[in-house]
Each structure stands twice: as structure tokens, then as C-alpha cells.
Amino acid sequence: MTNEKVNKVALIGAGFVGSSYAFTLINQVITDELVVIDLNQDKAMGDVMDLNHGKAFAPHPVNTWYGDYEDCKDADIVCICAGANQKPGETRLDLVEKNLNIFKGIVDNVMKSGFDGIFLVATNPVDILTYATWKFSGLPKERVIGSGTTLDTARFRYMLSEYFDAAAHNVHAYIIGEHGDTELAVWSHANIGSVPITELMKKNDQYKQEDLDEMMENVRHAAYQIIEKKGATYYGVAMSLARITRAILHNENSILTVSTYLDGEYGADDVYIGVPALVNRNGATEVIELALNDTEKEQFAHSVNVLKEILAPHF
């Protein structure tokens, strides 16, 4: 017999994002057990059947089944992907009213099971709904995490790698703030192989500031472009969720731009927002406070204020 810890993830919501997340978990050897929960039982059961039929090809056997809220009791992570989808022309913040009501029911049911793990929230507007999950659950703030700007940061690094012709894993740069229209690039800390991008710009006149400005707009509007072309975004965010899940279950102490609670950091308080944070088995345990320049401070404060204005009528 073995006494090794068995990692368990409960996924709530088997839509585009949820099913893509489940597929990624199984193929990246991240968890030992995965339970899929959805109001549409046939969809969830169909996903589980489909995933299990490929088990012979998976790099690691993952015990996958369809379940209900009671199965959350001993889960290490409950990942919420359920909720109303963003429609073409609709902002993430337009979804607030619809999804707050949905989340109250979900979180209440999860907590009734005796759940005492970590919530990982993917549904938009993710910063608002992560705050709501924290309020509804009563869990410590570090054990409620949103996907935040992890995907935006990945998009940013990809675009920078293409522009500067460098491998994406050698690009170090962050997108912080609201996962949405007020997010910002931290240009003052962006570098490639430890060389600041500002230095690269000075050394080579083929690099233009207007190109970087356009790049930031492309990062900010990437989701809208994808939704317009294919109806929804799901692969990228699923991979971001899987990355956060790995950091938690494998106790990595990785720094990821998750949506986490601020209590004075960056001059803000009582808000969940995307910033670099230390992520491990205990959740988002420490906010990494970057020294922002004056422009970045102003942009970040604006992002915080937008979120607080949305939260104010509800909490």
C-alpha cells in the first residue's frame, strides 16, 4: 500500500472552457482524480466518457468521473468554469448580474459539502466573481484565486517573442490589473534574457514604440477578436488554469499573475485583481509588489477603481 497524497480536482462547468481544462489536466499529468459537475448531466457524462476512452493514451492514469457537489468535500481544488458566456460585443463586466446569481448557488452548494480546499475561478468577469466567491465561501483570501491576467500575460509574452524574435520562455513581462479593458503592461519590468526592452529599443531603430502600443491593444482585445471569429475563447484560458492548478498541487511557489486579494499592496485594498503572486499548495500566499512607474501606478489605480465601482452595489 501507499500513503502518497492523491490530488483531486473538482470541475464545475463542462462548457468550452471546462472541457478544455479537463482535457489539459489529463494530458499534462497534473492531477490524480478529476470529477466533472454540470447542470447538464448528459454533457458532463459525455465528456467523462470521451476522456476515459482516451485513457490508454494518457501519460498518467487520471481517475475521471461525473459527480455532484458532494464530491467536492475532499477536493484540493474546485475550479469554477460555469456561468453565462460572453457574447460578441459584450464586455466581461456586462456579465456581472447574470453570473453573481449563478455563483451564489454554486459556492453555497460546494461549501455545504464540507469543502476546505482552494477555489480557482475562471468565469468572467473573473476579478468580480473571485471576490464574490471569497465573500460567499468565507474561506481565507489566499485560498480563493482567479485566473486573473495569466492568459493576458502569456499573450503578451508570445507577441513580444514574435516581435523581438526570441523564445517566449525567455521573455519576462507582465500584464496586471483587471482581466479586461483596463489591464496594463508593466513595461518598466519587461525584459528579454535579462535585457530590458527599453534598452533593446535604444539599440535598434527597427523597434518602434508605436508597434509596442499596438501590441498592447492587441493583447487587450484578443478575446474579442477570437470571440468574433469562433464564438468563444477556451484553449488559452484552459492552459492558464492548468498552469495555476499545477503550481498549487505540485507546491511550486511559482509566480503567476492570478487574481488575488490586495490588502494595501499597490496602494489598493479590498479588491481581487491580477498581479504577480506566489502560488503554492496553500493558494496565493504572497503578493509580489513590483515598483511601478508613475504612469503604471495611475493606470493600475484606474483599473482598481473600475472594479470597485462594479463591486459597490453588490457587496
Swiss-Prot record:
Which annotated residues bind NAD(+)?
17, 38, 43, 69, 83-84, 122-124, 147
Assembly and binders: Homotetramer.
Known regulation of its activity is: Allosterically activated by fructose 1,6-bisphosphate (FBP).
Q: Which gene encodes it?
A: ldh
**Function of the molecule:** Catalyzes the conversion of lactate to pyruvate.
UniProt keywords (A-Z) are: Allosteric enzyme, Cytoplasm, NAD, Oxidoreductase, Phosphoprotein
Name of this protein: L-lactate dehydrogenase
Tell me the route in metabolism or biology where this protein functions: Fermentation; pyruvate fermentation to lactate; (S)-lactate from pyruvate: step 1/1
SUPFAM superfamilies the record matches: LDH C-terminal domain-like, NAD(P)-binding Rossmann-fold domains
User: Which family does this protein fall into?
Assistant: Belongs to the LDH/MDH superfamily. LDH family.
Keyword check for Translocase: no
Q: Is the keyword S-adenosyl-L-methionine assigned to this protein? A: no
